[in-house]
Amino acid sequence: MTQVAEIKSPHEQRLEDNIAGKEDIYRESHKRVFKLLERFDGQKPAIDVERALYFTQSMAETVGQPLVLRWAKALMNVAKNITVMVQDDQLLLGRCGGHDGRYGILYPELDGDFLDIAVRDLPTRPQSPASISPEDAKIVVEQIAPFWKGRTYHEALNKALPAEVHKLTYDDPDGLISRFIVNETSSFRSSIQWVHDYEVVLKRGFNGLKQEMEEKLAALDPASPVDQVDKRPFIEATILVCDAIVLWAKRHADAARKAAEACADPVRKAELIRMAENAEHVPANPARDFYEAVQSQYFTQMFSRLEQKTGTTISNGRMDQYFYPFYKKDMEAGILTDEKTLEYLECMWVGMAEFIDMYISPAGGAFNEGYAHWEAVTIGGQTPDGRDATNDLTYLFLKSKREFPLHYPDLAARIHSRAPERYLWDVAETIKFGSGFPKLCNDEECIPLYVSKGATFEEALDYAVSGCIEIRMPNRDTYTSGGAYTNFASAVEMALYDGKMKKYGDVQLGIQTGDARKFKSWDEFWNAYVQQHMLLLRTTFIQQYIVIQTRAKHFAQPMGSVLHALCRKHCIDLHQPQIPEGLNFGYFEFMGLGTVIDSLAAIKKLVFEDKKLTMDQLIDALEANFEGYEDIQQLLRTAPCYGNDDEYADEIGRELDRMAVSFAAKYGKEMGINNDARYVPFTSHVPFGKVVSATPNGRVAWFPLADGSSPSHGADHNGPTAILLSNHNTKNYGMRARAARLINVKFTPKCVEGDAGTEKLVQFIRTWCDLKLWHIQFNVINADTLKKAQKDPQKYRNLIVRIAGYSAYFVDLTPDLQNDLIARTGHDQM
């Protein structure tokens, strides 16, 4: 019998060709950036300590001064002293230190109490390891860490949490070990994801912003306590930070001129001179052409990383919109080509990929495997006046993702009901390529929801995707506190074991709801679960309220603030809890939705309705982790499951969502924010699963939870459209205290083969859009390719896969997360 060859995605075929020694078909047209990429291919990132050192030196000298002014002075010290370098072949300037290749920087003000642990463990830890030289390690231990002992945000938060909240947050008195039940994320990022108003930099430059703030300074009332005590330090800080980034750029210009003087190659010499000219003009002044616009944005993006650890780095916003006027003008003038446009952009992509968003705490590393960072570029969508926004640049971004094999930056495509067929076709073709780009965000859900929460239509229509799959409205969003990740699968376990969890022995973590073996009805078990569920919600919101109050005393953001119209208008730092006219859109994560739905459905259906097993039999099987009880495990897997358009399971999911959203609506309002229910795990469904023992859906102990709002692994039997319908069925559309929902779908390349496959995928996307679901992302890959990469990681070094709102190199992931990806259902029919 003739064996049929396996259909491969273009990404898989490209890897196989490279393994076979064939020349990459795109190398010649992307020669420069391929050379840049090869310099750090497979390289473990290095820790660069310069930012932490110069930041710490300044902060030690300014103790007692207003925090926002101290922050600006520290940034000026960094700008003056940090190494500036010009990389061979690069066309852009702007690095956050002196390391060539992949590197990350430290933020001791955030989690400096972890520094000693980090220096010891980072090089060898399984999640996102990083190297550090002995000399730099000594600087960290002797010159940086001592100042921050007792001064870090993490230490302050650890002390501020009430005992009952602390117990569900941390597993040790010092807060160095996470419990993975109600996890705070604010101690490994000084704010959640963010998007700057890059357009104001391109149009006015930092000198223009500085002039605005100087005028505000001159207008202050000398007799006003508010003006002199609150506003003056803020204004002085914003002026200083404008000077700092301009100085930093000028130092890069000097370095480029020096490199040009020493360069014998006339072509490279001319490039270096032009790079110097760019850096002398931007970001101080408005950009005059496309190249300057790219350089100005890149300086702004990179200097933001020196300011503080913002979420998963600062997102890039709607690049195809704010770059388009420069692109159009230069194309019409005949001074720019599409090839050169891609070269400039891809030089930026490489620079962003080289910078690693370093998480030094063990919990931070577990949450963000594969060196996760999201500088999401948003394309498509609508203009502020409601017209389709796609343009020629939109298609160039998609082309770049198909041709240039790099996992950064992330690419997010906005979709709306009137999206052009050409755009949807190009999006589908890019998804089919197989590297996980782009993720999709739905205008039909996001825009009406944000208008209902207080945004104008113009503001909501202009949203940008930020972070994993959140959205931001530049100049209107003002909320920055890191959210909580709440493990609702632990509520199932605590309902089964009278408020205890196997992982934590006899510690009474939850409410004593009784011996579940003695429950005689579904109502009894449901009542026990609801009590544990509500305990987790209460803990989440108390924790987050303390986070909000504590952060304002430890963080300031003068650069982020000067780029925000409301901060400039009201002379208030972005980290303050309330900014006049701002909209505070925060969130907490509902972790393990599919696991919880399926577990509750199994108990309700099999134990109390069909009586196919008793609570004693169920708990005996769970306590044995199904060893010797494989028949019960298989029976549990026959129960109704989320992800199959099954009304029985979906009704339970809708009630779980209703409880979470109702709580958020009531107590978020009391806190003065929108602290809404969100279903986006990053990679945390893996470590959260490691604390949850066997669950009634047949999942074995310590196995990953269901991720985001996706089904449990192997539980989706009715095809991908049923996943969409279950997601729709479990949402409470009439309630507005809801936020993002992440959906992962895995197709085999055979499923989307050829033009017919592209058309099927386009129609699938239209169905998703019509259902008003927030997000969806795809892996188009064969499971065999992933298994081969596990066995021979060096050969598959460049295999890119979709994780949770971002793509990463498969071989950079831990075996647990690799296995999690392999276990996702690969649909071969649509």
UniProtKB/Swiss-Prot annotation:
One of its GO terms (molecular function) is lyase activity. Pfam families: Gly_radical, PFL-like. Keywords: Lyase, Organic radical. It is an enzyme of class 4 (lyase). It comes from the Bacteria. The modification Glycine radical is found at residue 805. Induction: Highly up-regulated in the presence of taurine or isethionate. It catalyses: 2-hydroxyethane-1-sulfonate = acetaldehyde + sulfite + H(+). Pathway: Organosulfur degradation; alkanesulfonate degradation. InterPro entries: Form_AcTrfase_GR_CS, Gly_radical, GRE, PFL_dom. Requires the activating protein IslB to generate the key active site glycyl radical on Gly-805 that is involved in catalysis. 2-hydroxyethane-1-sulfonate binds at residues 189, 193, 468-470, 678. Residues 31-700 form the PFL domain. Its EC number is 4.4.1.38. One of its GO terms (biological process) is alkanesulfonate catabolic process. GO terms for cellular component: cytosol. The active site is at 468 (cysteine radical intermediate), 470 (proton acceptor). Residues 707-830 form the Glycine radical domain. PANTHER family: DEHYDRATASE YBIW-RELATED, FORMATE ACETYLTRANSFERASE 3-RELATED. Taurine is an abundant dietary and host-derived molecule whose metabolism to hydrogen sulfide (H2S) by members of the human gut microbiota has many prominent connections to host health and disease. The human gut bacterium and opportunistic pathogen Bilophila wadsworthia produces H2S when respiring sulfite (HSO3-) released from organosulfonate substrates such as taurine and isethionate. Belongs to the glycyl radical enzyme (GRE) family. Involved in an anaerobic respiration pathway that converts the sulfonate taurine (2-aminoethanesulfonate) to ammonia, acetate and sulfide. Catalyzes the radical-mediated C-S bond cleavage of isethionate (2-hydroxyethanesulfonate) to form sulfite and acetaldehyde. Is not able to use any alternate organosulfonate or (S)-1,2-propanediol or choline as a substrate, showing that this enzyme is highly specific for isethionate. Homodimer. This is Isethionate sulfite-lyase.
